[in-house]
Amino acid sequence: MKQITGIYSAPSQHWVGDGFPVRSMFSYQTHGQQLSPFLLLDYAGPYVFPMGNNKRGVGVHPHRGFETVTIVYAGEVEHRDSTGHGGVIGPGDVQWMTAGAGILHEEFHSESFTRSGGELKMLQLWVNLPAKDKMTAPGYQSITAAMIPTVTLGKGAGKLRVIAGHYDDVSGPAHTFSPLNVWDLQLNHGRDITLYQPEGWTTALVVLEGEVIINGSESAREGQLAVLSQSGDALHLEATTQTKALLMAGEPLQEPIVGYGPFVMNNKTQIAEAIRDFNSGRFGQI
C-alpha cells in the first residue's frame, strides 16, 4: 500500500493575467523531486465571470523544457501558439502542449464564453521533460472529450477517464515522454475503490469536489493535495460524498530541476541559454 506522506491545503487564490483565478496546489519549488515528473498544478476556479465584450486571459509568454496540460471542466479557453496551433477547448477537453526547445503561446477565454459569461473551472498541470527530450521540437495535442475513454468502475464506485497512461487494458490518448498516468475520477457517495500504481512511482491526488478517505485513515477534501509514497503499489479511496479528483502518477525522472519563471531545465547554464534564446526571438512568433 502506498502510504500518505502529506495532505496539503491550497494557498489563497491569485490571478494569472485577468482571466484565471488560480490556487497553486504544488510547484517544483515546494515539492521538487517528491512529485517528479510533475512540476506544478494550478487549479483555476470555480469562478463565475459576468458577461463581457473583452476577452480575459493571459497574453503571449514563453515556455521551455516541459509540457503544459490544460484540463477544462467548465467554461471555454482559447489557445494560440508559435507553432501555428490553436483552438478552443471546453468542458471535458484537454490541451497537451509540449514546450520542448521553446514555444510562445497565449490563453484567453473564448469569444462565446466571454459574451455569455458563466463558471470557469480548469486545471493546468506542468509535466517535466527528461533531460534528453528538453530540446525536442515544440508540439500540441488537442484532445477532445470524445477521444478520452471512460471506464465504469466496479461495484458502483464511479467512473474514471484515462487522459494519459493506462487503466487495466484501457489506454489514454495523450502521448508522453516518460511513463505516467493522468486520470479523472468521479467517485460515488459511500463507494470505495482500490487503484494500483507501479512500485516506485510518484502518486498524488487533487480533490476538485467532495471528500475522500485515503487508505482508511486520512481524508482529503476540495482544494487539497494528497501525496503518497513512491513505495507500495496501491491506494484505497472511499468517497464520503460525491467526489471528483485528479490522480497523477509517474516514474520519477531523478534528474536535477532548475527553474526560472517559464523555463525549467537541468542547470543554470541552460536557463541562461533559454533567456538569451527568448530575448533573441528564437522562440518564433504568434
Task: Show the residue positions of the predicted features.
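Jelly-roll (double-stranded beta-helix
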Residues: 1-286
